[in-house]
Amino acid sequence: MLLTLASGALFFPGLFALSIWALHRLRPGWTEDDCLTVGTRLVSSVQAVLATWAGLTVIISCKNVVSDRHWLATEYVWFLIPYMIYDFYAMYCCERCRTKSQKLTRTTIIRNFLIENRLMVTHHTVILLFLVPISQKLRGDLGDFFVGCIFTAELSTPFVSLARIMIQLKQQHTLLYKVNGILTVTTFLFCRILLFPFMYWSYGQQKGLSLLQVPFNIPLHCNMANAVLISPQLYWFSLLCKKAARLFDTAKAKKDG
C-alpha cells in the first residue's frame, strides 16, 4: 500500500512537471496557460489509459463477479489517491494562471477555483472520503469485478481532454474536433452511463436474476453508491449532448447559408 501510494505521489506530479517543461521547449510560442492546460490534460489522459487497462484486466480475470479477486482492484485505488490530490493542485494552477493578469489575492483565486470547479471538486472529494474507504475496507473480499468496471469509466477521459486542448488552442472549427466530439459522446454513454446497467446485468447473470430484479436483491448501500456515482455522469452527459447539438447545428447553419 505505502509503496503504491508513494509511486503515485511521484508519478503524477512528476509527469505533470515533465509535460510542462517539454511543452515550453517544443512550443515556445505557447502561453503559460496553454502549457498548463495541455499538460494537465495529458496527465489526465495517461491516468485514464492506466485505469482502463487495470479495469479491463480485472474484468477479464474475474469469472465470478462477486467473489473472484484480482490485486489491481485494490492496488490501483491506492495509486489513484495521489492522482486525485494532484488534480486538485493542477486545476488550481490553471485557475491561478488564467486570472494572473487580474492581480487577485490568493483567497479570491481559491474561492473562484472552488466555484468554477465545484462539480469536479465535489466528485474528487466524494471519491476520496467515501468511495475509497468503501472500496478498500468496507466491501471486504467481494466485488473486485465491479471495481474493475468503475475503472473502465475513464475510457472517455482522453477524448474529453483532447476536446479541452483543442478549445484552448482554438481548433473547434476542424474536422478532428467534430470527430472527437462524436467519440466523446459515444464513449461517455457506454463507459459512464450504460456501465451501470451492465454491472447490474452481470450480477443478475451470476445469480440467476433478471436486470429488473437485481436492485431489489442487493444491499441498499450498493444502490446508493451507484446512484452517487451516476448522478454527476448524467449531468455531464447532458452537457456533452447539448454541446454536440450546438456544434452540429452551427455547422449545418453555415452549410445552408
Swiss-Prot record:
Signal peptide feature range: none
Membrane topology of the entry: Multi-pass membrane protein
Short name of one Pfam family: TRAM_LAG1_CLN8
Residue span(s) of domain TLC: 33-249
Transmembrane regions listed in the UniProt entry: 1-21, 42-62, 71-91, 114-134, 142-162, 181-201, 220-240
Listed InterPro entries: TLC-dom (IPR006634), TLCD (IPR050846)
Subcellular location: Cell membrane
SMART domains: TLC (SM00724)
Record's GO cellular component terms: plasma membrane
Keywords recorded for this protein, A-Z: Cell membrane, Membrane, Transmembrane, Transmembrane helix
Quaternary structure (record): Interacts with GGT7 isoform 3 and SLC3A2.
PANTHER family assigned: CT120 PROTEIN, TLC DOMAIN-CONTAINING PROTEIN 3A
Name of the protein described by the UniProt record: TLC domain-containing protein 3A
Organism: Mus musculus
